Amino acid sequence: MMTKFDVAVYELIKMVPSGMVTTYQEVALRLGNRAYRAVGTSLSKNPYAPKVPCHRVVKSDGRVGGYGGLKESEKKIEMLRNEGIEIEDGRIKDFERRLYKFGN
């Protein structure tokens, strides 16, 4: 069952343009809380991928992070690379330049 929180997360993620990433922390803070892990939980059950591009959400240090295991992490990396994002050693290259921050 989808919660109001899930819907709010999905609506925010749809705002992240191709070629950019955001973080679990950015999403949580934009929603007015610090529930970073709850954001990850919502994205793990995203029924609208890739329309809701959860592959564009990464860790706050620029690491690509989990995506349901190694095979799925490789899929996430491939999707990001297809959008022009360079990844080196599991991290977004030029992370600060690629980081999408939601307006307040």
Question: Over which residues does each language-model region extend?
Answer:
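Nucleic acid-binding interface residues in structured DNA/RNA-binding domains
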Residues: M1-N104
